[in-house]
């Protein structure tokens, strides 16, 4: 089954809507073709999983604290019962330094709640250099629609 996809319609939809929900074949391959075509047209791309994001907007754009995994017996008196908090640099800060637009491709987007999807959609509207593609499941052929339409459909 050849996939004759130039990526032009996908790119224009991504530029006009900013945030897309995509259904791609489970065997893979279609999304990497689209990513390659986006890179060729001047976009930076980053792929990450939606699992474990927590608050996606804070995780992607703001300085935030995390607690490292518990590795056995540790001194409770030093850091309290919860452990120390480490500050983590936002994922998108370093990538937004350049003038090139950025496409963030989120895998396993079906685990995100409706409010998290709305927050991601609002992030695309606030920061026009960020374009986000969220994989929302599988389909026999690759399909996409604006994230707002996908959210309101449910």
UniProtKB/Swiss-Prot annotation:
It catalyses: a plastoquinone + NADH + (n+1) H(+)(in) = a plastoquinol + NAD(+) + n H(+)(out); a plastoquinone + NADPH + (n+1) H(+)(in) = a plastoquinol + NADP(+) + n H(+)(out). This is NAD(P)H-quinone oxidoreductase subunit N. NDH-1 can be composed of about 15 different subunits; different subcomplexes with different compositions have been identified which probably have different functions. Its EC number is 7.1.1.-. GO terms for molecular function: oxidoreductase activity, acting on NAD(P)H, quinone or similar compound as acceptor; quinone binding. InterPro entries: NAD(P)H-quinone_OxRdtase_su_N. NDH-1 shuttles electrons from an unknown electron donor, via FMN and iron-sulfur (Fe-S) centers, to quinones in the respiratory and/or the photosynthetic chain. The immediate electron acceptor for the enzyme in this species is believed to be plastoquinone. Couples the redox reaction to proton translocation, and thus conserves the redox energy in a proton gradient. Cyanobacterial NDH-1 also plays a role in inorganic carbon-concentration. It is a peripheral membrane protein. It is found in: Cellular thylakoid membrane. One of its GO terms (cellular component) is plasma membrane-derived thylakoid membrane. It comes from Prochlorococcus marinus (strain NATL1A). The keyword Isomerase does not apply. Keywords: Membrane, NAD, NADP, Plastoquinone, Quinone, Thylakoid, Translocase, Transport. Belongs to the complex I NdhN subunit family.
């Amino acid at each position: 089954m050849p996939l004759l996809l130039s990526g032009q319609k996908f790119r224009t939809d991504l530029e006009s809507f900013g945030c897309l929900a995509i259904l791609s074949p489970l065997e893979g391959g279609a999304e990497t073709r689209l990513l390659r075509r986006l890179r060729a047209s001047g976009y930076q791309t980053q792929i990450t999983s939606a699992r474990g994001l927590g608050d996606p907007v804070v995780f992607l754009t703001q300085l935030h604290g995390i607690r490292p995994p518990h590795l056995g017996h540790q001194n409770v008196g030093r850091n309290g019962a919860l452990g120390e908090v480490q500050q983590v640099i936002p994922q998108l800060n370093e990538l937004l330094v350049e003038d090139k637009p950025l496409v963030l491709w989120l895998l396993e987007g079906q685990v995100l709640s409706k409010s998290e999807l709305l927050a991601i959609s609002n992030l695309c509207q606030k920061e026009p250099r960020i374009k986000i593609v969220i994989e929302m499941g599988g389909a026999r052929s690759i399909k996409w629609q604006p994230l707002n339409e996908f959210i309101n459909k449910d």
